[in-house]
Amino acid sequence: PIFIGEWGFPTFATTDTIIEGNLGQLKYRELYIRTAEVFDRMGVGSIKAWFLGNRSMQNFLYGGPSTWSIFNDSTDVGTAERKYITDVISRPFPQTIAGDIQSFLFNHATRTLDLNIKPDNTKGASKIFIGANRHYPDGFSILINNDFVMYYNPLKNVGIETYKAPKGANPSDFIWDEKSQKLIVLKWPFDKEELVIKVVPGIRNFN
């Protein structure tokens, strides 16, 4: 396994107040998205430095005062996010998979998580971080091999609902954990077979 520690470009003081330009939030967000895509395609884990924030800025690079903090509060322990950073690093991803991950990628433009796995149910449960409150306030749909389809409606307090399921699949094995914003899979429907999984925005957003 490969783990990337403390990656990322420092945030300049001006970045919090401007959208365009080399130090603007759009350019900054694009840089982080492209970096996150590389990590996803490589299948590596990563962390972002200074999660708790830093009140003081320093001159790390040419461009003026900057900080590594992902929060912009004036306190040490921040809660006001720099969302042009946090919305990227907190993207959906397969946190724990019982079996082998073949590939995964979150597309920020379409808000689609593509995940290919070869499950092994003898290894326990799987967890996929969705972050619905951030990325899917309009709900999301889960497609497995296109013949097992479920969805989550944030306006209803019923968890994951099933649109269609193949023979032998048990929808009750799929549990939505609202507190952790994770999809917990107790058992995959097709053990030791390659599965093509998609998480897409919207309720019943499928053909």
Q: What are these model-derived regions, one by one?
A:
Residues 1-10, 44-50:
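Structural recognition of the beta-strand scaffold that forms the well-ordered cores
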